Amino acid sequence: YNVKKVFDVTQTNGRKAPAVSANRDPKALITTMLDVSPVEVAATDELPYPNMAAFYNNEKQTLYVKRNVGDSVAVAQCVAQELGHAQLSINSESYSRRDMGFQAVCIGYMICKKYGVDTQNFAINRIPEGLASKEPKEIRAELSKTRNAMAEIHSHISDEMFRKKQERSKDYER
C-alpha cells in the first residue's frame, strides 16, 4: 500500500492562482497596481533618485510615479517594488526604507514574476548582511512579513483584475 494524505476539492477554500503568462500587458498591470495602491498616488516630473520610475515617500504616505518614462516594463518593476515599500510601512510600526529595501525588492520580484513581467533587473541573489547574520527564527519572521505583504498586494491586484474582466464581459454582452 502507498498511503498518502489527500484532500477533496470540496474541503479546500483557496482560489485558483492566475496562470503566469508572458504576454500580459505591463501597462494594464501598472494601471491595476496604481488603482489598488494602499497609499495616495501622485504623478511627478522628478524623483529623489533619477533612475527610478516610482518612489514611495513614507512621511507623506504617497507613491510618486514619474511621468513620461518610455519603458513600461521598468515602470511596472518600480511600481511593484515601491508598492512593497508602501505595504511594508503599513504593516509595521517602525518603517525604515533602508532596512526594508531587500524585502521590497523581493515583493516587487514576486509580483512581476506572478504577472509575467521581466524580473532580470531585481537583485534578489544578494542577501543583506543584516539578514544573513540573523537566527533562523528571526529570518522566518522577516520572510513572514514579506509573504504577508505580498499576499495582500496580490489579492488586491487579482481582485481588481477579476472585477475589470467582469466589467468587460458585461460590456461584450450588450
Predicted regions and their residues:
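N-terminal accessory/interface modules of nucleic-acid-binding and processing proteins
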Residues: 1-174
